[in-house]
Amino acid sequence: MNLQLDYFSITSFLVFLVVLFRIVSDWNKKSTNLRLPPGPSKLPIIGSVHHMIGLDVDLPYHALTDLAKKYGPLMHLQLGQMSLVVASSAKMFKELMKENDLAISQRPVPYVARVLNDAGRDIAFVPYGDYWRQIRKISRMELFSVRKVQSLYYIREDQSNKMIDAIGGSAETVMNLSKAVSDYTSTVVARAAFGSGCKDQDKFIKLSLEMVAAAGAVSTLPDMFPALGFIPVLSGKKAFLQNIQKEADKILDYIIDEHIQRTKSKDYDGKESDKEDIVDVLLRLEKTGELEIPITTPDIKAVIWSVFAGGTDTSSTTTLWAMSELMRNPKVMEKVQAEVREKLKGKKEILEADIQDLPYMRAVIKETLRLRIPGPLLLPRETMEPIEVDGYVIPEKTKILFNAWAVTRDPELWENPESFIPERFIEKQIDFKGTNYEFTPFGSGRRICPGMNFGIANVELPLAKLLYYFNWQLPHGMKPEDLDMTAKFGVVCGRKNDLFLIPTPYNIEVEN
């Protein structure tokens, strides 16, 4: 009996080995025939996932940079059922974003976006096609044009004054700058999206911040292994996310209905106005009949969520990283404060029109976006057809990931890339509008972030005021080099821990 059992066990094991060998052989043969970019070896089912063991997976852009050093600037990874090509050099960025921009204009829809049921209308993930062209045109010409962003100056001035007053109330004591900046940015975005004085605005802001944080915490496993979609269900994260959205949707329904009722009043003339918020603009365009594809209430909600997800954390994160780097680099802080205080000398109140000639402060912002890029991995693209890049063939429906963090720290492109040196942007004119592929914090090509003008405007004024009105100290006698600069990866890559500083009011000599 034991002999029969042993024979059966040995036979079963041999059959298993033969089957496994065939699977691995077929896998390798298929990969070889595709002429894919180089990458780590792949196992059946899990692909290249095992190569991530031992790497810094909490900050995946670190792990991908380490792998790229071994396999090159164009690298193929098989993560479960996800076929992924990672670009990690400015040259590969240009090859993909410029030479193959149309072929990779599709965006893969992540699991978390599908959970929220707005993936087909969200600005970031809307499928390439007629509706994408329409919402893209609306975004660039109406919602986030230079003129429209400038017209919202009064919101930024008002909210930044409130931020400065709040900080002044904590003078000479340790205060949470992260909270002050986050409150400023989220309120500016809310007022730009649906106006001021709306019912439950503060509650919606709170829910939106919870939504962004919860979305960043949802596992990416269902994207790699669709069969594991039950994990966020069992963990309760899917239900938690949907409950937040359901509660926030009730507020948005009220806001949108309130705007619709306003358009029905006899005083409404249907004309464009500098005081229009995003909901006003969308309803005006719909009412004029200028749109080829009608905009529905779910569409308006999706746009608002896009604005909050893309505009709130990104701007506040950039401002806080800038202040963090300035605290770590006292000489840079001294230089930028000298510029701001010299140009604005004697002004008791700073207006947005006053900060147009601050080249060094703008260089500080650019250097922050380089060294502490809020989105170190740009939102992925997806090939709509096979493409050839650098002699390799990338099949249709392959996801393309851009490791911008690796590019902005490439020693071949940047001298002393780990150091905070704003002067590099004074000496060499490099912009972030998508044509300098060594510096693409907002992406490039057809899928470049349409709200970058809005995002930058939400950084410049508050940063100028923080530098003008206060001198800053680290708490508890901390030395600059001891300031915690640990990052946390999520929807954006911000500080892991809040930034606590001591503000001291600057003695302004007011001009007569």
From Swiss-Prot:
Enzyme class: oxidoreductase
Catalytic activity: tirucalla-7,24-dien-3beta-ol + 2 reduced [NADPH--hemoprotein reductase] + 2 O2 = dihydroniloticin + 2 oxidized [NADPH--hemoprotein reductase] + 2 H2O + 2 H(+)
Domain of life of the source: Eukaryota
InterPro entries: Cyt_P450, Cyt_P450_CS, Cyt_P450_E_grp-I, Cyt_P450_sf
Cofactor(s) annotated in UniProt: heme
Record membrane topology: Single-pass membrane protein
Chief location bin: membrane
Swiss-Prot/TrEMBL keywords: Heme, Iron, Membrane, Metal-binding, Monooxygenase, Oxidoreductase, Transmembrane, Transmembrane helix
Ranges that cross the membrane: 1-21
SUPFAM superfamilies in the record: Cytochrome P450
Key word Iron present: yes
Keyword set includes ATP-binding: no
One cellular component term from this protein's GO annotations in UniProt: membrane
Tissues where this protein is expressed: Mainly expressed in petioles and roots, and, to a lower extent, in leaves.
Binding positions for heme per the UniProt entry: 436
Subcellular location: Membrane
Role description: Monooxygenase involved in the biosynthesis of limonoids triterpene natural products such as azadirachtin, an antifeedant widely used as bioinsecticide, and possessing many medicinal applications including anti-tumoral, anti-malarial, anti-rheumatic, antibacterial, anti-inflammatory, anti-pyretic and diuretic effects. Catalyzes the conversion of tirucalladienol to dihydroniloticin.
Name of the protein in question: Dihydroniloticin synthase CYP71CD2
